[in-house]
Amino acid sequence: MAVNVYSTSVTSDNLSRHDMLAWINESLQLNLTKIEQLCSGAAYCQFMDMLFPGSIALKKVKFQAKLEHEYIQNFKILQAGFKRMGVDKIIPVDKLVKGKFQDNFEFVQWFKKFFDANYDGKEYDPVAARQGQETAVAPSLVAPALSKPKKPLGSGSAAPQRPIATQRTTAAPKAGPGMVRKNPGMGNGDDEAAELMQQVKVLKLTVEDLEKERDFYFGKLRNIELICQENEGENDPVLQRIVDILYATDEGFVIPDEGGPQEEQEEY
């Protein structure tokens, strides 16, 4: 039976969006680029198969799911696995399948803690387990201008990969000499220009996702601030401690004036 985890998703040891995607991709040998892609439920099903072999009917999981009713079917399989292993967590299927960042990010933060509490370190070949299937991306989760080619995962005979339970890595695209390969036969540089444009598109998507993550956490902090303000006159030491943390700044940090820095930003 599974070890249940009841901690909330708002803790200091949470992984960032990039670290979470890196953990998922390395553990399952996938190429997810957005947290929203977890809305299909397929990755969770395979993680359950990794943790508790036989708890999930993995052959019934639709890794190529692109429609909402297919996502729901995958989550039904996940729910059955939860029930079989005694997992108490209620899956908010109706929210997850909509593909919104906040709902999916909160759930995967909980799932990471659940995974860490139950993973025993055994080897697992994710590609062989899903018979070489790759996850599809719904059209609504892809930017119209993006046409990034799928990265090869290597041969099917690759050695089983051991998932990373706690290691933090970064999944941000790396810009370096190795990313641009100039074709000696192309004198006009069209291939190089196209690849550079592709890198720009990927970086723009990364910035958009980081802004979503920033707004997500800012919203939570704002809600906490409002609660503190509503109870400001109660002289609660715990409440005061929370307020102190909310308004604390790093040593040497100076809040910029509204007048001067604007010109500098425009010049930059």
Curated annotation (Swiss-Prot):
Single GO term (MF): protein kinase binding
Mod. after translation: Acetylation at Lys-220 by KAT2B/PCAF promotes dynamic kinetochore-microtubule interactions in early mitosis.
Entry keyword set: Acetylation, Cell cycle, Cell division, Cytoplasm, Cytoskeleton, Golgi apparatus, Microtubule, Mitosis, Phosphoprotein
Sequence segments annotated as region (Interaction with SKA1): 232-255
Signal peptide annotation: none
Pfam families reported for this sequence: CH, EB1
Residues that bear N6-crotonyllysine: K66
Start and end residues of each stretch annotated as Interaction with APC: 206-211
Modified residues (Phosphoserine): S155
Compartment annotation: Cytoplasm, Cytoskeleton; Cytoplasm, Cytoskeleton, Microtubule organizing center, Centrosome; Golgi apparatus; Cytoplasm, Cytoskeleton, Spindle
Domain spans labelled Calponin-homology (CH): 14-116
Subunit structure comment from the entry: Homodimer. Heterodimer with MAPRE3. Interacts with DCTN1, DCTN2, TERF1 and dynein intermediate chain. Interaction with DIAPH1 and DIAPH2. Interacts (via C-terminal residues 206-211) with APC (via C-terminal residues 2674-2845); the interaction inhibits association with and bundling of F-actin. Interacts with CLASP2, DST, KIF2C and STIM1; probably required for their targeting to the growing microtubule plus ends. Interacts with MTUS2; interaction is direct and probably targets MTUS2 to microtubules.
Record protein name field: Microtubule-associated protein RP/EB family member 1
Originating organism: Rattus norvegicus
